[in-house]
């Protein structure tokens, strides 16, 4: 179960930054837009509005995101990424890439070249099973 090990390692990386996996997912969604409402973030994460608010509160406390009033509609509050949030995302992703490189270092060039094709094939097959 490779995914179990990769996820476990990912959680360990996040602990270094005192961020939970759902908080990191939220941070990534916030980073994908120039501003996102709590409601939109809730929908994207399939979480209750209150749960998403708690996540954003924690991220704001860590100075990774900030709430702003929308310029076009003062009733809307947008969540935007702070520079420290961008830095955390980059550091975490780089550590994940490094981990994948480490665990594939024993593969020869031919195996490494085949790996993406094999993974794509497995993904297509799994999607067939899900979608009938």
Where are these regions (language model features)?
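N-terminal helix-turn-helix DNA-binding core of bacterial DNA-binding proteins
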Residues: 8-48
